[in-house]
Amino acid sequence: MKKFFSIPVILGILLLTASCTRNNAQRDFEQDAYTAPAGYTETTAQAEIISLDEDDWRTSPLFQGLINIVPAYPNPVATNQQFYLEIESLFNNSINGFEVIVRLPNNDLYTLYQEFDTPLTGVKTILLDPLELGIDGSPEAARGLKRIYIFDLDGQMISYGDIMVE
């Protein structure tokens, strides 16, 4: 009895295995994202990193090599300042738009910014108000460590990171 495996069958098995591995990596990434914020990447107003939190602003497995996220700056940020996020599309058609979301203390999600440009090309710099990170827009509600998420418009998580509002 001959054992015969065709090249298309072997390639199909390899693609299926790679797909499962990537899906597992994305699922693990998203599980990390939904844990409570702990620590943050400290940055200057010029986006220089002072201390790096290895968990902050990683690019998800689905977007690695396609999107680069510059950590939020300045971080920490005062309630009377604004802070920036930079999202760089490394290739044309990497993503078709995105949204920036914060999880409020009552677990509601609040959209801070939406970008509908399709496709996103180059670097997009977003200016955000830390008062929007609180439940009622007050300085008291905004203070503390807040987690921000970045999703594409298809609902796939691109990145997440923590902001300290002082």
Placement of each model-derived feature along the sequence:
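Sec-dependent bacterial lipoprotein signal peptides
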Residues: 1-22
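Short, compositionally biased serine/threonine- and acidic-rich segments at solvent-exposed termini, linkers
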Residues: 20-64
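C-terminal tail/sorting-segment detector
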Residues: 25-37, 145-166
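Short solvent-exposed strand-capping/beta-turn motif centered on an Asx-Ser/Thr pair
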Residues: 88-93
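Surface-exposed loop/edge segments in extracytoplasmic proteins
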Residues: 106-115, 157
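Short, surface-exposed loop/turn motifs with a glycine/proline- and acidic-biased composition
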Residues: 118-153
